[in-house]
Amino acid sequence: MTTIDVVTPDQVDTGELIELYDSVGWSVYSRDVGTLRRALAGSSTLVIARDSAVLIGLARVVSDNATICYLQDVLVKPSHQGHGVGRALVQAALEPYANVRFD
């Protein structure tokens, strides 16, 4: 069963993050774990998808919580693409920003 949760960066294992980013070919993000962790920590919202406790997706938002909202890093493992996981991640990530402009 797939679950979608808003989390803090420290709730996601580094190894899982690297595996997810590598699975979609974004290995430039996973080469420097410190930079990846800082990027996630600087996000306004971090949403993850799990299937039977396995990390299968992630989306993050960068926002000033007033006038702008940027959807960033929407990733879904290839084995789970095409099943609505990405859509669910985007909806959950953007939900808190209903009154903010999207770019």
Could you describe each region identified by the protein language model?
Residues R37-I48, R101-F102:
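A short helix-loop-beta-strand connector motif used in the catalytic cores of GNAT acetyltransferases and
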Residues I48, V54-S63, Y70-L75:
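Conserved beta-strand in the GNAT
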Residues V90, Y97-D103:
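Conserved GNAT acetyl-CoA-binding A-motif
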Residues M1-R31:
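Short amphipathic alpha-helix that is part of the acyltransferase structural core
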Residues G34, Q91:
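Active-site phosphate/pyrophosphate- and oxyanion-stabilizing loops and adjacent acidic/basic residues
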Residues H80, G84-L89:
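Conserved acetyl-CoA pyrophosphate-binding loop and the N-cap/start of the following alpha-helix
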Residues S63-L71, Q81, V100:
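A conserved beta-turn-beta hairpin within the catalytic core of GNAT-like acetyltransferases
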